[in-house]
Amino acid sequence: MSRKILLVAACALIDADGRILLAQRPEGKSLAGLWEFPGGKVEPGETPEETLIRELDEELGIQTKEACLAPLTFASHTYETFHLLMPLYVCRRFEGIPHGREGQAIKWVKPNALRDYPMPPADEPLVATLRDLL
């Protein structure tokens, strides 16, 4: 069966204490209540890095630059109606204080506590890679 391929870029924001920022999917969206790495859909003509710069500003009110985004790994996961490809970047340098601009809860989480936050199936395999990095 042929499924649409959806390209989404995600970012593991890491603070000075080595914690990772998670955002909770708001009510009314698919997978509501689950925690995820901030990011969003790559629009036509946009690179994943451009997507993250835009989405981090829109969703969290923070600014970063392409040079501050380091590609780490990616997720490839088949959902019922589409296949998700999601590069995950790490960002340690950004300006501003993250806050949920779209009504979503956010939380800084120690790497060893990431498993305590229910995540979408595509995000779950990324946790081990991040724990190994930090």
Language-model region placement:
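Conserved Nudix-box catalytic region and its N-terminal flanking loop in Nudix hydrolases
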Residues: R19-E58
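Generic C-terminal helix-cap and adjacent flexible tail
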Residues: M1-R3, R131-L134
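A short coil-to-beta-strand element that immediately follows conserved catalytic motifs
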Residues: Q63-T73
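NUDIX/MutT-family hydrolases
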Residues: L88-V90, P98-L130
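Active-site-adjacent beta-strand/loop module that shapes the phosphate/pyrophosphate-binding cleft
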Residues: L6, D15, T73-I97, K107
